[in-house]
Amino acid sequence: MGLYLNSDRSLKNYEELYRSDYFVDKSLIIERLNKLIGKRSKYLCITRPRRFGKTSVADMVAAYYSKAVDSKDIFDNLNISKVNSYEENLNKYNVINISFNKMPDSGKTYDNYINMIKQSLISDIVKYYPNINPHEFFTVGDILESTGDQFIFVLDEWDYIFSKDLFQENQDDFLEFLTFLLKDKPYVLLCYMTGVLPIKRYSSGSALNMFDEFTFLKDRRFGEFFGFTTDEVLKLCDENQYMNFEKLELWYNGYTTANGVKIYNPRSVIKALENNYCESYWTNTGAMDEVSQYLKYNVLEIRDDVIQMVAGEEIDIIKEKEYIQKFKVENEGKEVLAVAICYDSKSKEHHCKIEAI
């Protein structure tokens, strides 16, 4: 097994999730992905806040497509097994699965980081294609093209170095690496990429412009696959028998997707069911210091907005059509608040509101 190419890591991760007490079947997203294979719309980037199941879905996608594993025993029991394209695509492809949240032990520079990724992928390619001499090629993409095969890419936490504010002087280099690896390459059958914030947040011009982006506020195609729907939470409550849905709804109250589907944060729901107790389970999802400076200096009257919400009132959320490449506080005050405190509504409009529990 390779580290990135045709790894069994995703299947092992998904098996663990599948065996958990409160498993929710999100496999029907695969039916929609199957329709994109080998087409112009094969590049998609799905972004969500932390703890909304992005990595779990990525593991599922890789475990389904990879021909290096046999995942039929699991997927035969899931909803995807009932669709026409199920058998046709199950365990049929070379899969390159990279999570960008790993740092090398040998050093903490950008060169250490990117070379770890490149060398690991090259090593995997040589293992599967022993007749290829990597020294004859200039880029990883050239090596992949020389195989004559096609690949499905599953890329998780693509924006890790941006969200962690690492290697500022090399962030454009990283965008170039992804662009040269993926854009207009005949060996790419499908590229499924996830992150916290959209590509437009960091990129302008032609970098990664081949991707269709699906953000929390604008995703009308995949919204129900990230987070738990009301029906899914009701079913989990029935399985639990001790926790009633009304209590979970009072505490967590859900989020409304772009097409009106109510979504609950998986971590909060699962932890409440495991402990038979509702409280805030949003630990380690984001640093408070990302918000504190805006409150301290009342940037764009954000502090006033928070006071208004604590009083039980709602504030409108400004949804920008595009993200700015270089983030500037003066242009995105409401967006910072939406990300920091979250948005929650029973209507089809987006507001920020704090409710006392």
Which residues make up each language-model segment?
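Domain-level recognition of nuclease-like catalytic cores that cleave nucleotide substrates
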Residues: I324-I357
